[in-house]
Structures are given as C-alpha cells and as structure tokens.
C-alpha cells in the first residue's frame, strides 16, 4: 500500500470539503523528523492564500473534516499551517503483517502502460567504454522497476550500426579476407582493425574511393556489403553481451533496435516534412526552422534533416525512431537514457515530431539525462595514459579489488566461494556507486569509496542483508515459518515499520522520475533503521515468544525488502560474506 497516496487522497477530500477549489494539491510528504509525525500535509497554506484566509484557521477547518479513522492516532497543526499526521500503531502493525504475507511486499501493480526504454546504445566495431556505463545501468534499473509495477516495457538498444565508417570497415575486411581467407575476430581485434581502416582511408586514395562506393552499395542493399556489415555487428554484440551478463543487465540481442532499422523511413519522413511545409530547401539541404530555438543572432534555428548530397542525419533518424515507437510499438511513454549533452538535439527532434503530428502530446517523450563519470582530478575518467577506459577493463579491476577485500575480511572461505562472492560484490559496487548518485550530476569515480563497508555503498547494503538473514540461521527458523501478529512494544519498532511501509513510495518514485538513487537512499535509511531497532530490541532473547516472533517478522520483512530493492537495481544479494 502507498500510504502517502492514501493520506494525500484523504487530505484532498478534506480540503475540498473545507471550501478549497476542486483539485487543490494536498502536497502530502514524508515528515523530515519524527516530532513532525510520519507525514505532513503542506498544501493548506497555498490554498489559504488563494482564498485570502488565515492558514492556521483554514488548517483547523480541514482537520475538522479530515477522516483518518483507523489510520492516524494524532493530527496537529504546526507552524504557519502545516498538518502533521501520526500513524497509529495498530494501522502500522496491520500493514506490516499484510506486506510480509504478500510476495510483492504490499506493492500494488499499476495500470499497465507500454513503455519503450532507450538505453545503453554502444557503437558497432568499437568496444564499450566507461561512457556507456551510466546509460546501461540507470536504464536497466528503471526498466526493472517499471516491470515490477506491471508495465509492458520494450527495451530498445539503439546501437550505432550505420554510417559512412562502415564503407572503410567493409573495404578493409574484404582486403584481409582476400589476403588470409576467412576472418575470425574478437572485438579487441576490431578496435585495432578500425584504426587500421581509418589510416588506410586517410592515406590511400584508391582505398578511400572503394570505401565510399561501399557506403553507397551498403545503403542500396548489396548482398556482399550486407554480409560484411552483419559480421561486424555480430562480433560487436557478442562482446557487448559479455559486459551485460557480467553486470547483470537484462539486455539481450533481441533488444537491439539499431539506427539501421529506420533507414527505409528516412526518405519518406523528409518527403512528408516537405509536403507539410515544415522542411524547406536551404543552400541545397532540407531544413526545418524552429522558432522554439534561436541561434546566436536571435533567429529561428535551422535543423538539417537531409544534407545537400542526399544523406540523412542523426536528427532524421531520431524523428523516424520516435514515430516508429508510437505507431508500431504503441508506446505510452518513451524514456531516453542519454547523456545530458544531447538534450538540445533531442528537444529539436521531438519538436519536429510534435509539429508533424507523428507522436501526440498524450505520449510522454522523456529525456532522462545523466552527468559524467569523473576521475579524482575532476576531469572525465581516463586511463593513466589519458585514453578511454574500456568497460571490460574496469570490471576486471573491480573483481581484483573485490577479491582482495573479501580475502582480508573472510580468509577462511574456500576458493570457489571467495570467487563467487568477490564477483558479486564487484559488480554490485560498480553499479551501486553510480546508481546511488543523483542521475543528473557528474560524480567522481573512487575505488576506495565504492568498496567500503561503511556508508551508502553496495558492500554495506549487501552485508546489511546478510546480517539480517543470518538471524534466522541462529534462530533455526525460516522466514516463512513465523507465527503470530506483529506488535509494537518500542518506538524503534514503530520507526522501522514506518520506514518499511515506504517501500512502495520509493518504487513508484523511481518509476515516475527515472531516478534510481531514490531507491538507494531508501534502502540505506532502512538499513540504518534496522540497526537502531536491532540494538534496542532483543530478538533471539526477547522477553516472551510473541514478542520474539513479532521481531523476527520485522527482521524478515526487512531482509525481503532489501533483497527486492537491490534486485530492482539489478544487484544480487549474498547469504554469506
């Protein structure tokens, strides 16, 4: 149950009954401090101002008609007109019991929407690097959360699988095959192969002519070029899948929807934009001028959709892509997990999409932008030599460092278990370090911070789960075998339950805002509440069996909530660390 939404509805009804205009926001929020209750309604002051009445007097009118029977034990007016709401112990205990008995921990499924999520999007013929990490793991965490809430999510890995560079790659691939027979290569070879192809293109005019011809042939559907192009895509995606699997990212080859998918749509898009009078010829190119965007001279900015040589641009592809996602995939929402530097480009493409009538306003197009990963020097994260960090190398180093950490913490584990634990901790550390930061900010990549057992880190959260789960081994009872009802005998129990029952609010916030750090913050706070409860409220040596069973139930609900929350982030838990 979303208690915040429940109370918000109740306060909204009371506002209207007290004379507020229909639809006035109740603005119910979780209280910042326990002395202000569990929730606080902040909408009274805004309504009172509109009505020209005293906020505290109007707040009293709202309280007079506010029906929170069976939910709140106390309500009070605070400050200039806030309403503090204290949940009743009976309500909290009952809801906690219901959450523990529910495989979804009390989280209701939402009315299903079709949601397209565009994330990861590496380039063909190049290895994934650290710049792909944020889109990949942020997008995947939000996708998992949306699916948990019952939505139909279509993963769209918009890989860079088209462009003039494929002419030189195919020409070089043909040259190598003619010299040495069938080519079998890993993507690591392909990086060098790409550089070699570029060098030949720049220095050998005959090769450059052939490469340009192959671009035309590839675009025309030439069988040989199509076969070579497919080989390049296959080699790339095999390597990318290894990275996805290591990171426990849910993308597969079936989710690839590359730029090439939209090639056939591009001429029709430009023709239609011309027919609608949106695209006009300017210096031989087809351009859409947008009043919504101004150039440095204050004039409508021109967005090129077809070059003078007949070629199309990324904007044209993005227009076709949005159109396809609405018309063919039936999207209600389209989420783009793309670098913040691409914001204006996307906004221009979407403005054209709306003007052309390709996607109605009822469909939400959302840019879930993110900042950069920085080194300790505050500059973009690079190798010591100043090069781009390969994602596979980063994951390798994470595993080495995690193995050293586990060895120092628990040297008596056998080798196989150490390896399993260190790999799980390594991937969790890389992901959680990123996901716990606000998506839109740049953040500093720090190995020591990432692998610390203190603070809001993956090792801390994984250990928090292991610690709670170990209570049941000591008690000799399974989590699903507990008896009796949850009862509240201590303020720490009440505080823990209140935090546990905010899980649905955290899940829905991540889904709505595309901000996984909300879940990380919630889980970290939950772990802290459990520690306070554990220190104040003996479990295994509780004064009577009913209290022991109740506290074991709270431990079980905590363990299950942490496990489910981390799972939504794509992070695995461990029974032993």
Curated annotation (Swiss-Prot):
It is found in: Cytoplasm. Keywords: Aminoacyl-tRNA synthetase, ATP-binding, Cytoplasm, Ligase, Nucleotide-binding, Protein biosynthesis. Its main location: cytoplasm. GO terms for biological process: arginyl-tRNA aminoacylation. A motif ('HIGH' region) lies at residues 122-132. GO terms for molecular function: arginine-tRNA ligase activity; ATP binding. InterPro entries: aa-tRNA-synth_I_CS, Arg-tRNA-ligase, Arg-tRNA-synth_N, Arg-tRNA-synth_N_sf, ArgRS_core, DALR_anticod-bd, Rossmann-like_a/b/a_fold, tRNAsynth_Ia_anticodon-bd. Pfam families: Arg_tRNA_synt_N (PF03485), DALR_1 (PF05746), tRNA-synt_1d (PF00750). PROSITE patterns: AA_TRNA_LIGASE_I. Belongs to the class-I aminoacyl-tRNA synthetase family. This is Arginine--tRNA ligase.
